From Swiss-Prot:
Subcellular location: Cytoplasm
Organism: Ruegeria pomeroyi (strain ATCC 700808 / DSM 15171 / DSS-3) (Silicibacter pomeroyi)
Gene Ontology biological process terms, A to Z: amino acid biosynthetic process; aromatic amino acid family biosynthetic process; chorismate biosynthetic process
Protein name: 3-dehydroquinate synthase
Keywords in alphabetical order: Amino-acid biosynthesis, Aromatic amino acid biosynthesis, Cobalt, Cytoplasm, Lyase, Metal-binding, NAD, Nucleotide-binding, Zinc
Length: 370
């Protein structure tokens, strides 16, 4: 059931291995990258309690030893204090340029560990072993690393490609239903932005995938990663097509900032709501039929996911404040917001030609339902 997706970036190319049981094979797969048979592992306390011993055994089976630092779980870890702690620990471990750092966790750990590897000694190689669905299909692939700033999400970082990604789909079985569905928000995004047939497949197979069907999970992760790999190979540093991967994220990042990057709204939940809002905005601008946002919301609802601002607990700021929060988005060019909109399911495109009033109206209507 193992699948391999190749990310073609010349000298920085690497493989993404996908399937159950990869943690047990970690040593054999990572050893060829190592000048000395040891790795420094950055993880979080939740993942460490569930999977760290399995990783230690998997590495040892390939003759590789490890030291590990477990950081607190959650988005609040992705900031300067824990980043400094991780970087100091890596220096304490005497990690050299020829060594490999292993990011073992979800998107927060992958982003932080990758950024630490990018700047440590001006660049150390790293391997991603993503343990959440969101990280397996999105953040572990493509080389975006970084941390959050007081001004907004992911504003401090670097492009630093991993040397290998091991996506063990068996660990997805240990995720809470909420965390799994948050990751599913990113899976749906791929169908919505460029593969209508994949969205059709998800409408049929989504329930089996959520229920634990391993073949369906491997297929969903593989198709998602393949689409991302193809886009990254064309546009590694987000000068063009790669911005399509941010479908739903302009709304999402504003909502995450408005909820204090807290458990009120997980990133993947924000992406799902953001995709629904992006399709609603597209329909109101006459770019796609009203049937499309209805279909998007219907599938998300059928999967038991958040689809509207009403699904976010607690108070939200006004539409004006939310639009102002969008102005801190990384996709802003010359002060203009760039939106990813759609001419239909699977037909996303990037545009700066979106009237502020149209965005305000969509948000005001969504807030009025709260």
């Amino acid at each position: 059931m193992m699948k391999t997706v190749h990310v073609a970036l010349g000298a920085r190319s690497y493989d993404v291995e996908i399937g159950p049981g990869l943690i047990a094979e970690a040593g054999a797969r990572i050893a060829p990258l190592l000048a000395r048979k040891r790795v420094a592992v950055l993880t979080d306390e939740t993942v460490a309690a569930l999977h760290l011993e399995a990783l230690r055994e998997g590495l040892a089976a390939g003759g590789v030893t490890m030291e590990a630092l477990a950081l607190p779980p959650g988005e609040s870890t992705k900031g300067w204090p824990q980043f400094e702690r991780a970087a100091d620990w890596l220096l304490d471990q005497k990690v050299e340029r020829r060594d490999v750092v292993v990011a073992f966790g979800g998107g927060v750990i992958g982003d932080l560990a990758g950024f630490a590897a990018a700047v440590l000694r001006r660049g150390v190689r790293f391997v991603q072993i993503p343990t959440s669905l969101l990280a397996q299909v999105d953040s572990s692939v493509g080389g975006k690393t970084g941390i959050n700033a007081s001004h907004g999400k992911n504003l401090i970082g670097a492009f630093h490609q991993p040397s290998l990604v091991l996506a063990d789909t068996a660990v997805l079985g240990t995720l809470t239903a909420r965390d799994f569905l948050a990751g599913y928000g990113e899976v749906v995004k791929y169908g919505l932005l460029g593969d209508a047939a994949f969205f059709d497949w998800l409408e049929g197979q989504g329930p089996a995938l959520a229920a634990g069907d391993m073949a369906a999970r491997v297929e969903a992760v593989t198709r998602s990663v393949q689409m991302k790999a193809d886009i990254v190979a064309r546009d590694e540093t987000e000068q063009g097509d790669r911005a399509l991967l941010n479908l739903g994220h302009t709304f999402c990042h504003a909502l995450e900032a408005a909820t204090g990057y807290s458990d009120r709204l997980l990133h993947g939940e924000g992406v799902a709501i953001g995709c629904a809002l992006a399709f609603e905005l597209s329909a109101r601008l006459g770019l796609c039929s009203q049937e499309d946002p209805s279909r998007v919301r219907a599938h998300l609802k059928a999967m038991g996911m958040k689809t509207d601002l009403t699904d976010i607990p607690g108070d939200l700021p006004t539409a004006d404040v939310l639009v102002d929060l969008m102005a801190q988005d990384k996709k802003v060019v010359d002060g203009q917001l760039r939106f990813i909109l759609a001419r239909g399911i699977g037909q996303a495109f990037v545009t700066s030609d979106v009237p502020r009033e149209a965005v305000l109206t969509v948000l005001e209507d969504a807030l009025a339902s709260c």
